[in-house]
Amino acid sequence: MTRHSTDGLGHRQAIRALALPALIRLVSEIADNGPINRRRGSLQAAFGNLTANQLGHAIDRARDFGLVYGDEHERVRYRLTDSGEDLADVYDTAARWARTHQFPAATSDFVTRVQHTLPLLGQDPALARDVARVGTSGGLLLPGGAVLSPQATSALDGPQAALTAWLQANVSLQHDMALHTARTADEMETAA
């Protein structure tokens, strides 16, 4: 098994930033259904189950990270950048792996699958060497007590390669993502 290194604090913080559920929804929705136009109610129709705050936060993060763009005077309000399109492919790859391996559960939705898979992709490659020695079924013991089979762990190579390639192509964004992740954590701590 060839593991692609995504270790390092910057990568882990970037992965945490990319795992924001509303950001996953925003990027995936635009990738699947095309740009969101300026018609009244189009944002609410596309993201009816997100609160205005969740949607606003996701749009702000996506803009800050260079994933979406739009001109207030254009008919199209939000569209994905090339980086956003590539990230949508990473999300799809992660979700396919998770669906195949029923992770984190057999009935998980797309966002939950991506949100739980991205942190696995950033794990230290040394964990892969331990896969035969950890867990009751010879798999990788995950936080919460779940065990990932050796086959599932081995199959992480594809999604991890996709994420690593995206992070390397967007290395300039990692600093911004780390700042936003730290700021969001501080804001949440203050609010609690």
Feature map (PLM): residue ranges:
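Basic, amphipathic "hinge/linker" alpha-helix immediately C-terminal to the N-terminal HTH DNA-binding motif
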Residues: 73-97
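Amphipathic alpha-helical dimerization/coiled-coil segments
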Residues: 89-190
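A short, conserved structural fragment
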Residues: 63-73
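C-terminal regulatory/effector modules of DNA-binding transcriptional regulators
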Residues: 30, 191-192
